[in-house]
Amino acid sequence: MKLTPHSREWYARLARELGGYRHPWTRVLDGPDPELTFDALLAERLGPGVRVLEAGCGHGPDAARFGAQTARWVAYDRQPELLALARDNAPHAEFCLWDGRGAVPDALRGPFDLIVSRRGPTGVIGHLPAVAAPGGRFLYVGPTLEVPQVPERLVAVGWTIHGEWRVSVRAWTPRWEDWVTRCEWMGEEARQEDWETRATARGLPYQEERYVVLAGAE
């Protein structure tokens, strides 16, 4: 049965078949991973006294990689199958099942010095005034060069953008099946004509894009 991309059932299948929230297509990058900007900004803001809230943690790769460098790493996701993997991958972190709607659960109230989201839900922005400590920061990376709801929602809660980065790296999908899967993931149309006219021995080129933003209440 074909599942709707980004539906709960679709994420459950990713957890079951891929062991986490991972790109289900093969890609080859011509340069550094565009998410390295987010990684660098995150790493330089961690420390033994820093309390972190992660929105949309998936199977917990960031909690596993960075959590031990903090005073507390708390994360939430709406998908129970992914949270089960996250708890195994990062036993030192705290995880909560939540879809970002309604009142913030007590376990997520913080306060937190850093709120992060790696291609996760932007709805967390509406909760920043409730969960952020004085001087807290919000760090986000999205899957395209423009994610207009992020600056719009930051303005709505009175937060200021301190920095924006747009990174684009050429990538290749080596097979037609990879291109179809990538387009489904991104909500784009996979056209056979594009493959037939533009694909080379390396596959079809496209731009792997990221939008990174750092914001604060002042």
Q: What are the residue ranges of the model-derived segments?
A:
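Short "lid" loop at the C-terminus of a central beta-strand within the Rossmann-like core
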Residues: 122, 143-148, 166-171
